[in-house]
Amino acid sequence: MSATMKQVVLAAYAKGNPKPADFRIEEVPVPQLGEREILLKTLWLAVDPLIRFSLDEKLLSGATRMERGAVMVGPTVCEVAASNHPDYASGDIVEGRSGWQEYAVLAPDQSDYRGPPRKVDASLAPVSTALGALGGPGQTAYEGIVNVGKVKAGETVVISAAAGAVGSMAGQIVKVLGGRAVGIAGGAAKCAALLDLGFDAVADYKAPDFAEQLKTALPEGAEVYLDNVGGDVTLAVLPHLKRGARMPMCGFIAYYGVGMEGPGPDHLPGFYRQIMAKALKIEGFAGIFAGKKGLEDIAGWMKEGKIRFAESVVDGLDAAPQAFSSVFSGHDHVGKLLVRVAPEA
């Protein structure tokens, strides 16, 4: 093992969508292992859009700001390279939040609310799925469709950002439950990928006839709208929701880079009118509430061939800043966007 390693640090707070220049790659010594600590070698890292909340100089309420020069945070899958902790052995594969770096030392006994690094069962699926289908995105999709959306057989569910990690899983879960899945994505390639995953219909929000595509895809409206984006896409969907429709809200990526006020005119009065007129049931949620049952159900569906995991992979830690920036700029990736930092043994 080399005596030094690479890590990606925050060079500047983001203004609008993050740019590669907001980050800096540094070479530092590999950290030394202390008592009851584990040394992790990063295999995979996820460039999650939620990280964006921590990159503003002026924060949204509830977010924790990163300091300039700090190692970028984010979920990872790692191999235990060395261990001074009885619960972990060299060679174990774990999922945690060790950040954008080639190696990290963690003290499992001093973990935050997420708990210590979770061991990954490589017999269930490729270990990278611990960051996607069998990780946070899978839990979020499950929570939104099963527990919050309460989707029933025969219902139509429309999903924004459907080609993303959460959306692509959510549509497949809808199909497992006997529902009709309608996906909204940007570009013909993404829409074709959704149909290949089993979605019943798609609408391309980048197309000039998006409104007509949406009308065609939802001839009788929808009982559930899983909203991942907010913004103009959600404004276009609202007229198609049936009275009493459920609207699980798990993201608003259209606004992640604009601060508290948001851009342009205030659409809230019109939004309120739609809520009142249609008696919409809106609920924000977090995927962590899906818990163990959600992951067990998803693993079972994957084993039965009812759900496929979609991943897009870029190689090398150096690629992480560009990969993260692409999440906010209409990238062509489908499913979970991952950075392969090192090959698996």
Label the predicted regions:
Residues 72-79, 86-161:
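NAD(P)H dinucleotide-binding glycine-rich loop of Rossmann-like/cofactor-binding domains
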Residues 93, 156, 180, 245-246, ...:
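Short glycine-centered segments of the SAM/dcSAM-binding site in methyltransferase folds
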